[in-house]
Amino acid sequence: GLPICGETCFFGKCNTPKCTCINPICYKN
């Protein structure tokens, strides 16, 4: 599995740096 950023996302953007939104969770690049 991908490392989770600990952030949820709803519009394709994550506030955490170097994180990508895979709805509804942000994952580290």
Swiss-Prot record:
One of its GO terms (biological process) is defense response. Keywords: Disulfide bond, Plant defense. It comes from the Eukaryota. Disulfide bonds join 5-19, 9-21, 14-26. Pfam families: Cyclotide. Probably participates in a plant defense mechanism. This is Cyclotide mden-F. It comes from Melicytus dentatus (Tree violet). The lineage of its organism: Eukaryota, Viridiplantae, Streptophyta, Embryophyta, Tracheophyta.
